[in-house]
């Protein structure tokens, strides 16, 4: 009997997931990455052009991710045409690289219910929806700070954004991302339990814009 129950549990979730079509989800997660920190932990080692000082990147768009209240869809069979090279290159001003734009479409955009043009347009609108705290661009040296300071700055800069609607992540001792939860019409909403996992680092590194 226990074996039967275990088998049901193991196979129930994928079956339910298959019933969810592209465009059928609960809310979005907008992921903003602090580019200088990504470059320090990952990009410099890759020789990424995103890290060239001429770009002056601060908070860039990592992606706009369809989300369930528990879990998330990815790599959906949408039947939509993939983006053209010109479409992915057009996103580099806010995403840093055409490769990231392509990957985000393939992994997350295919689950949005939009075609590539619509998904990128919505991603750009979501990015513009958020006021990115200006104080971080004024840094002229690397500092250590609690992750909660970054969260507080976003809360102060964005009227209507509540603590349960944002989470700050860290990677390799650096502030990595601000993740903000939005409705389909880009209003602030609470994040699900699997999204709200704040970084607890009290001395996270934050490097200045290059």
Regions found by a protein language model. Give the residues of each.
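N-terminal signal peptide c-region/cleavage motif recognized by signal peptidases
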Residues: 12-14
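N-terminal module-boundary/linker segments of secreted carbohydrate-active enzymes
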Residues: 18-41
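Sec-dependent signal peptide recognition
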Residues: 1-7
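Domain-level detector of nuclease and nuclease-like folds
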Residues: 29-33, 43-210
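Sterically constrained small-residue positions within well-ordered secondary structures
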Residues: 8-10, 21, 171
């Amino acid at each position: 009997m226990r074996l039967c129950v275990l088998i049901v549990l193991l196979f129930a979730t994928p079956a339910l997931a298959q019933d969810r079509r592209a465009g059928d989800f609960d809310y979005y997660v907008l992921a903003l990455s602090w580019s200088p920190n990504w470059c320090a932990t990952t990009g410099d080692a890759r020789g990424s052009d995103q890290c060239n000082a001429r770009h002056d990147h601060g908070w860039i768009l990592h992606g706009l991710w369809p989300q369930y209240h528990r879990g998330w869809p990815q790599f959906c069979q949408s039947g939509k045409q993939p983006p053209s090279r010109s479409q992915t290159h057009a996103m580099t001003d806010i995403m840093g690289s055409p490769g990231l734009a392509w990957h985000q479409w393939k992994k997350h955009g295919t689950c949005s219910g939009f075609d590539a043009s619509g998904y990128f347009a919505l991603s750009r609108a979501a990015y513009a929806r958020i006021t990115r705290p200006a104080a971080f661009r004024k840094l002229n040296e690397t500092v250590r700070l609690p992750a909660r300071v970054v969260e507080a700055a976003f809360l102060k800069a964005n009227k209507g954004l509540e603590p349960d609607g944002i989470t700050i992540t860290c990677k390799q001792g650096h502030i990595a991302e601000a993740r903000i939860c939005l409705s389909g019409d880009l209003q602030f909403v609470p994040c699900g339990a699997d999204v709200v996992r704040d970084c607890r680092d009290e001395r996270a590194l934050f490097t200045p814009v290059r």
